[in-house]
């Protein structure tokens, strides 16, 4: 009986406690200040602002073709748009038509006809979405540090994760750019945003680095070197997997086939000459190694000349990197360096080699400019070929620049850079 009484006592105490709470909750609710109704701007939105300017009639047509007019005129939202004027659109139409339409001189109706009819609506949408940012970025707010200031566009990379989006890369300086396109005008005001004007269209990429590199006929040795460097690696430790990972942000310096042929000939020649002292034998063997083509890297007889670890070091030296806060992988390939991001003065840039040797100075990069245009781009390596040269005396020229992929950019070089 005593036990039952104790149980009921606890039961009643619980009920009474609840009643106290209920009684307390019956007090008048605190009156909070009403949430103010947002005050939205009035006037022309981004699309309407361009439509009202005759010098942007072609880009206005592009917005219409893209089905983005309503979005860009929504005064409850804010935008930054990297657009281009009619001159820039003429350049774009000429390129998009494969040169069938000249960059100047054709009637306006010809350019508008291509935009309104020949350009796929999906392509137009991709261009406008890629150049649209969902907040205001006045020119003064765009970063000026190396290499650029990545900001999020309207292109969603993963439909299951709507916040994982493609970036675009403006930078502010003596000359300002979006990606590698010079900005010729900034801060055109619209009621709901800001419009910056590029020299032409900054086109969105559509393939990963792996896919684009696979299509380069002059990079067969580089692809073979990557395969050799990936021996024994798994996951994103494989360069091949990293180059196919859509949400990375990389810069690759890819030596062309002639560059690798020169390196292979020289290394085999030096090795055989040191062993035999016979220049004829050394030349014959070096020519035979070059004759193997890219399969040189998968031929066991030459594994001693270029072990997989050495090839991995060489490939890593051609991927630019920066220092992060990660304690496991402090140096990561997370910067997208366009040619116009490279200073005119020689500048050291870290690479993935720094992941193993933090004190390594990296590669030395230098660009030459005529106005906003990059007229030459070169990279010098710490090591030289033949060995024995002063650090950074061995220089490769970029023969192709600014090949833009979803997950990075690459430049094709005429020499293989050596980390030591």
Enumerate the predicted regions with their spans.
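Mature, structured domains of secreted/extracytosolic soluble proteins
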Residues: 2-8, 25-420
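Sec-dependent signal peptide recognition
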Residues: 9-15
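C-terminal motif of bacterial Sec signal peptides marking the signal peptidase cleavage site
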Residues: 20-24
């Amino acid at each position: 009986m005593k036990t039952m009484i104790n149980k009921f006592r606890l039961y009643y105490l619980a009920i009474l406690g609840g009643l106290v709470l209920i009684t307390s909750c019956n007090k008048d609710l605190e009156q909070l200040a009403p949430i103010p109704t947002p005050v939205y701007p009035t006037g022309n939105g981004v699309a309407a602002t361009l439509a009202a300017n005759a010098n942007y009639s072609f880009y206005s047509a592009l917005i219409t073709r893209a089905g983005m007019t309503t979005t860009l005129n929504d005064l409850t939202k804010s935008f930054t748009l990297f657009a281009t004027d009619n001159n820039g659109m003429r350049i774009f139409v000429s390129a998009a038509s494969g040169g069938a339409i000249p960059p100047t001189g054709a009637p306006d109706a010809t350019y508008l006809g291509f935009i309104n009819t020949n350009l796929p609506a999906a392509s137009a949408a991709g261009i406008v979405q890629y150049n649209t940012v969902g907040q205001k970025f006045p020119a003064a707010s765009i970063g000026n540090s190396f290499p650029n200031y990545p900001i999020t566009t309207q292109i969603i990379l993963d439909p299951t994760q709507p916040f994982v989006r493609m970036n675009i890369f403006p930078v502010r300086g003596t000359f300002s750019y979006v990606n590698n396109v010079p900005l010729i005008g900034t801060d055109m005001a619209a009621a709901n945003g800001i419009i910056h004007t590029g020299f032409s269209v900054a086109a969105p990429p559509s393939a990963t680095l792996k896919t684009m590199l696979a299509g380069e006929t002059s990079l067969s040795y580089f692809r073979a070197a990557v395969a050799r460097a990936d021996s024994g690696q798994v996951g994103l430790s494989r360069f091949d997997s990293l180059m196919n990972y859509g949400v990375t942000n990389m810069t690759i310096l890819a030596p062309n086939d002639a560059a690798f042929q020169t390196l292979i000939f020289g290394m085999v020649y030096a090795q055989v000459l040191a062993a035999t002292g016979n220049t004829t034998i050394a030349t014959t063997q070096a020519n035979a190694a070059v004759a193997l083509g890219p399969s040189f890297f998968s031929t066991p007889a030459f594994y001693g000349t270029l072990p997989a670890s050495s090839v991995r070091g060489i490939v890593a030296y051609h991927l630019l990197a920066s220092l992060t806060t990660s304690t496991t992988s402090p140096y990561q390939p997370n910067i997208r360096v366009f040619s116009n991001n490279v200073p005119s003065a020689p500048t050291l840039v870290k690479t993935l080699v720094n992941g193993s040797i933090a004190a390594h100075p990296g590669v030395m990069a230098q660009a030459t400019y005529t106005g906003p245009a990059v007229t030459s781009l070169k990279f010098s390596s710490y090591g030289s070929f033949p060995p024995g040269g002063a650090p950074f005396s061995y220089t490769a020229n970029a023969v192709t620049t600014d090949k833009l992929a979803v997950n990075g950019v690459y430049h094709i070089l005429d020499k293989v850079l050596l980390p030591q």
